[in-house]
From Swiss-Prot:
Similarity comment text for this entry: Belongs to the class-I aminoacyl-tRNA synthetase family.
Binding site for L-glutamine: D67, Y212
Motif ('KMSKS' region): 268-272
Amino-acid positions noted as binding ATP in the UniProt annotation, renumbered to this chain: 35-37, 41-47, 231, 261-262, 269-271
InterPro entries (UniProt xref): aa-tRNA-synth_I_CS (IPR001412), Gln-tRNA-synth (IPR004514), Gln/Glu-tRNA_Ligase (IPR050132), Gln_tRNA_ligase_bac (IPR022861), Glu/Gln-tRNA-synth (IPR000924), Glu/Gln-tRNA-synth_Ib_cat-dom (IPR020058), Glu/Gln-tRNA-synth_Ib_codon-bd (IPR020059), Glu_tRNA_lig_a-bdl (IPR020061)
GO molecular function: ATP binding; glutamine-tRNA ligase activity
Statement: the UniProt record of this protein carries the keyword Metal-binding: no
UniProt EC number: 6.1.1.18
Catalyzed reactions per annotation: tRNA(Gln) + L-glutamine + ATP = L-glutaminyl-tRNA(Gln) + AMP + diphosphate
Protein name listed in UniProt: Glutamine--tRNA ligase
Keywords: Aminoacyl-tRNA synthetase, ATP-binding, Cytoplasm, Ligase, Nucleotide-binding, Protein biosynthesis
Keyword Aminoacyl-tRNA synthetase: yes
């Protein structure tokens, strides 16, 4: 991560500053604990930047720990993708990758300790009955009939659970806290359940698996985490976090702090719903460029720096808010405007014949790769008698505000000549098939000698040298600002979230590297698609337009 990226300040950093100043901690130790049941999204990027950024700024440590306590939903594919995404974002975890499953034996022993203290019991209510007995926000829960089993009986039954003598759903281990608590999370939460499923790290060695709230706090303590940072939905869970650590024999007691999660307009952050988009084939996969997964953003052409900058700009607070999509797009637009080399592409081509040039006219024009950064060099672009321009850059008639090519009037070709539209050809349906123009041969990259003013500059590619290319114009996947609020979020899919066009690019794009950014002049920022683009078939993804074209109401 660049040192030029400004160090932020927020309430968490203020807490850390106080802890270091008063000697509570001598070093900061954070962690990023994703569950490997899906790909990371932009919301996880905020947590990554917070946890790894704090460790980096305070010269501390940050662990990458996989919360792998549910083998049914987890997969090594997700483990590898998460590691790849963290590193791509510019961060490196301390030491080896860690897994909650590394601590399964210790977690089991702590569960046994709670049983021995009369603070946990084996319950044989069904999952449905447990939910019913738990009560609601307005009514207290009621005790399970199995709550007062003896320590000896609970130890025996828990051993049978571990040995696979109970079927799934017929028994679980619950913490014995308070069924009348105002906090539902403290109403005898389940801390172990039975799952007969192979685990990607431990195989079939276990058939009982600890729940997140039991695992998380103990894993933090075992790793010496000083500041356990979670999003606000875990605020009530902090009471259980502290209860577990207060009631087991463990020397370290980390503290949990909550911050607001990222809520972004026109986006879904639920892994379950993101998975549904994939399984229902609404999108191609987790790395579909319309998905706000880290891999999807990377494939679309977002840089790691732009995502870090977005996370810096939105900051870290305790108040939930909704961030406009324009804020994310602004970060990548600023990045690419500064760093992306320029090139020319025509997405909806119409041929232009410059009749006063010789039939086989060909020349090379030197163009800057960036108008404001000479250190990025130049490129040689071929120019010929026949070129392509964008269909939207010509009108037979237009008012004075239209500063492109009009029949009988002039326009400048980017870094080339001033041309004049003399006549047009149309097909039987009235569609323009060709423009016949003349050029002022003395205007190559300079103004007309007679001083006449030519307003408007358009881009072009040489028809003889142009490369056929596919352009994937991506837009927001959802058509409403808050798709999660819809009864069926799938009904809010934007039908124009992907528009595919066939066009042409200048020949230098033949060797465009996957994900390398370009500004196609007057069209937007694009990159070669990492999946479909080859030297024989060029496919470019639009990362973002040159300017924000969405009003706040999404129109």
């Amino acid at each position: 991560m660049s040192e030029a990226e400004a160090r932020p300040t927020n309430f968490i950093r203020q807490i850390i500053d106080e802890d270091l100043e008063n000697g509570k901690h001598s070093m900061v130790h954070t962690r990023f604990p994703p569950e490997p049941n899906g790909y990371l999204h932009i919301g996880h990027a905020k947590s990554i930047c917070l946890n790894f950024g704090i460790a980096q700024d305070y010269k501390g440590q940050c662990n990458l720990r996989f919360d792998d306590t549910n083998p049914v939903k987890e997969d090594l594919e997700f483990v590898e993708s998460i590691k790849r995404d963290v590193q791509w974002l510019g961060f490196q975890w301390s030491g080896e990758v860690r897994y909650s499953s590394d601590y399964f034996e210790q977690l089991h022993n702590y569960a046994v300790e709670l049983i021995g203290k009369g603070l946990a019991y084996v319950d044989e209510l069904s999952p449905e009955q447990i939910r019913e007995y738990r009560g609601s926000l307005t009514s207290a829960g009621k005790n399970s009939p199995y709550r007062d089993r003896s320590v000896a009986e609970n130890l025996e039954l828990f051993a049978k659970m571990r040995n696979g003598e109970f079927a799934e759903g017929t028994a679980c281990l619950r913490a014995k806290i308070d069924m009348a608590s105002n906090f539902i999370v403290l109403r005898d939460p389940v801390i172990y359940r039975i799952k007969f499923a192979d685990h990607h790290q431990t195989g079939n060695r276990w058939c009982i698996y600890p729940m997140y709230d039991f695992t998380h706090c103990i894993s933090d303590a075992l790793e010496g985490i000083t500041h356990s940072l979670c999003t606000l939905e875990f605020q009530d869970n902090r009471r259980l976090y502290d209860w577990v650590l207060d009631n087991i024999t463990i020397p370290v007691h980390p503290r949990q702090y909550e911050f607001s999660r990222l809520n972004l307009e026109y986006a879904i952050m639920s892994k379950r719903k993101l998975n549904l988009l994939v399984t229902e084939k609404v999108v191609e996969g987790w790395d579909d460029p319309r998905m706000l997964t880290v891999s999807g953003l990377r494939r679309r052409g977002y840089s790691a720096g732009s995502i870090r900058e977005f996370c810096r700009r939105i900051g870290v607070t305790k108040q939930d808010n909704i961030v406009e999509m324009a804020a994310l797009e602004s970060c990548i637009r600023d990045d690419l405007n500064e760093n992306a080399p320029r090139a020319m592409a025509v997405l909806d081509a119409v041929k232009v014949v410059i009749e006063n040039l010789p039939a086989h006219h060909e020349q090379t024009i030197c163009m800057p790769n960036h108008p404001n950064r000479p250190e990025m060099g130049t490129r040689q672009v071929p120019f010929s008698r026949e070129i392509y321009i964008d269909r939207a850059d010509f009108r037979e008639e237009a008012n004075k505000h239209y500063k492109r090519l009009v029949l009988g009037k002039e326009v400048r070709l980017r870094n080339a000549y001033v041309i004049k539209a003399e006549r047009i050809a149309k097909d039987e349906e009235g569609n323009i098939t060709c423009l016949f123009c003349s050029c002022d041969i003395d205007t190559l990259s300079k103004d007309p000698a007679d001083g006449r003013k030519v307003k408007g500059v358009i881009h072009w590619v040489s028809a003889e040298h142009a490369l056929l290319a596919e352009f994937r114009l991506y837009d927001r996947l959802f058509s409403v600002p808050n798709p999660a609020a819809a009864e069926d979020f799938l009904t809010t899919i934007n039908p124009e979230s992907l528009v595919i066009r066939q066009g042409f690019v200048e020949p230098g794009m033949q060797q465009a590297l996957a994900s390398a950014p370009y500004q196609f002049e007057r069209e937007g920022y694009f990159c070669a698609d990492s999946v479909y683009s080859t030297s024989n078939k060029l496919v470019f993804n639009r990362t973002v337009g040159l300017r924000d074209t969405w009003a706040k109401n999404g129109e």
